[in-house]
UniProtKB/Swiss-Prot annotation:
InterPro entries: Enolase, Enolase-like_C_sf, Enolase-like_N, Enolase_C, Enolase_CS, Enolase_N. GO terms for molecular function: magnesium ion binding; phosphopyruvate hydratase activity. The gene is eno. PROSITE patterns: ENOLASE (PS00164). Mg(2+) binds at D246, E291, D318. Keywords: Cytoplasm, Glycolysis, Lyase, Magnesium, Metal-binding, Secreted. This is Enolase. Transmembrane segments: none annotated. It comes from Baumannia cicadellinicola subsp. Homalodisca coagulata. NCBIfam families: eno. CDD domains: enolase. One of its GO terms (cellular component) is extracellular region. (2R)-2-phosphoglycerate binds at Q167, K343, R372, S373, K394.
Length: 433
């Protein structure tokens, strides 16, 4: 019943209007798994390769027909007849067939789409939800938790057409007792923030991830507006709601001068000065998580940043670790950061992703399952967060259906699991920071 009989790839459109890969895996007995992969805007240098056509006559060169052809050709031929229940085996077949370290032959977008579709088809054949199947694959059957969300409410950097340098300003509803309550709190603050922005004569258009994207003079002005919105929504900042930021500092780094540029504020920092600047922000505002606080290659700087901030807050590696077991292990050995952002398409298979989560947890690092700025309606990351008990999830704001699809899936999962999947709130962040 779990034997693969057909694999189909197709080119579909993501939330930015760019092509991406969707795959179907069909099993004997009529079971089907469907998966679509996302795409990032600010990407780490060592991510698995997202294969694009480069044909400027189609989608400005961003077509994915080569990746789709890989799915419909060599990948399909290699997988037909194999058992979809053996996820690791399926993923290893594709990795070996690709034959490159960064999946550049077929593209991580092709391989990941099939990897996830395989897991979904196997879950369907077993008659169980995807999160339950993932927990079984993870060796943690029937062990679930609901993730604390990082809700993006103001976009900047590469995710918005504005002058804000820091890429994401997020809230975490830490006083919530359930994911349902956390989402409600997030939505309320999101709406009150719109009122605050309008009252200050600012527009409320949104960026790639659904957060508002106004033009503001400084990062502190952003944080002050969020503070006002939280208070007007009836919550206490630092008690009910905490803050998180994604600096995406590789995008702020100037390799010619080895300096960090906040163009919106007209400020220039050395590596140590930028960490000191972030430290000042954490003292003024209840920021308990900072992602990519320095350039991905600034490991000496990260050692200093971890020394200064690592015992106080969560320091998240995204571009720093790119969901790579090898790079994460190096970071652990050097004592860099204390948390990792998990993005399926940075590594390219479900099996490798779960392995990285295990390595991080065993080292005492927190794990945050994440979307990308170019998303689809696929909700796999919600199931992955619950099935691996990752602890936290980052999937955008309270607008754009590509973001809300994941939140709504979490609501369904919580309804299904009830007390079997506790919502641990702030404990998920504090356990390592």
């Amino acid at each position: 019943m779990s034997k693969i009989v057909k694999v189909i790839g197709r080119e579909i459109i993501d939330s930015r209007g760019n092509p991406t890969v969707e795959a179907e895996v069909h099993l004997h007995g009529g079971f089907i798994g469907l998966a679509a992969v996302p795409s990032g805007a600010s990407t780490g240098s060592f991510e698995a390769l997202e294969l694009r056509d480069g044909d400027k006559s189609r989608f400005l060169g961003k077509g994915v027909t080569k990746a789709v052809s890989a799915v419909n050709g060599p990948i399909a031929e290699a997988l037909i007849g194999n058992n979809a229940k053996y996820q690791e085996c399926i993923d290893k077949i594709m990795i070996k067939l690709d034959g490159t370290e960064n999946k550049s032959q077929f593209g991580a977008n092709a391989i990941l789409a099939v990897s996830i579709a395989t897991a979904k088809s196997a879950a369907a054949s077993k008659g169980i939800p995807l999160y339950e199947h993932i927990a079984e694959l993870n060796g943690t059957a029937f062990q679930f938790s609901m993730p604390l969300p990082m809700i993006n409410i103001i976009n900047g950097g590469k995710h918005a057409d504005n002058n804000i340098d820091i890429q994401e300003f997020m809230i975490q509803p830490v006083s919530a007792k359930t994911i349902k309550e956390a989402i409600r709190i997030g939505a309320e603050v999101f709406h009150y923030l719109a009122k605050v922005l309008k009252a200050n004569g600012m527009h409320t258009t949104v960026g790639d991830e659904g957060g508002y994207a106004p033009n503001l003079d400084s990062n502190t002005e952003v944080l002050d507006l969020i503070t006002e919105a939280v208070e007007k929504a009836g919550y206490i900042l630092g008690k009910d709601i905490t803050l998180a930021i994604d600096c995406a500092a590789s995008e702020l780094f100037d390799p010619l001068t080895n300096k960090y540029l906040l163009k919106g504020e007209g400020k220039i920092f050395t590596s140590q000065e930028f960490t000191d600047y972030l430290n000042i922000l954490t003292k003024k505002y209840p920021i308990i998580s900072i992602e990519d606080g320095l350039n991905e290659s600034d490991w000496d700087g990260f050692m200093y940043q971890t020394k200064v901030l690592g015992n106080k807050i969560q320091l998240v590696g995204d571009d720093l670790f790119v969901t790579s077991a090898k790079i994460l292990q190096q970071g652990i050995e050097k004592g860099i950061a204390n948390s990792i952002l998990i993005k399926l398409n940075q590594i390219g298979t479900l099996t490798e992703t779960m392995a990285v989560i295990k390595i991080a947890k065993n080292a005492g690092y927190t794990t945050i399952i994440s979307h990308r700025s170019g998303e689809t309606e696929d909700t796999t990351i919600a199931d992955l967060a619950v099935g691996t008990s990752a602890g936290q999830i980052k999937t955008g704001s309270m607008s754009r259906s590509d973001r809300l699809a994941k939140y709504n899936q979490l609501l369904r999962i919580e309804e299904q699991l009830g007390k079997k999947a506790p919502f641990n709130g702030l404990k998920e962040v504090q356990s390592q920071a």
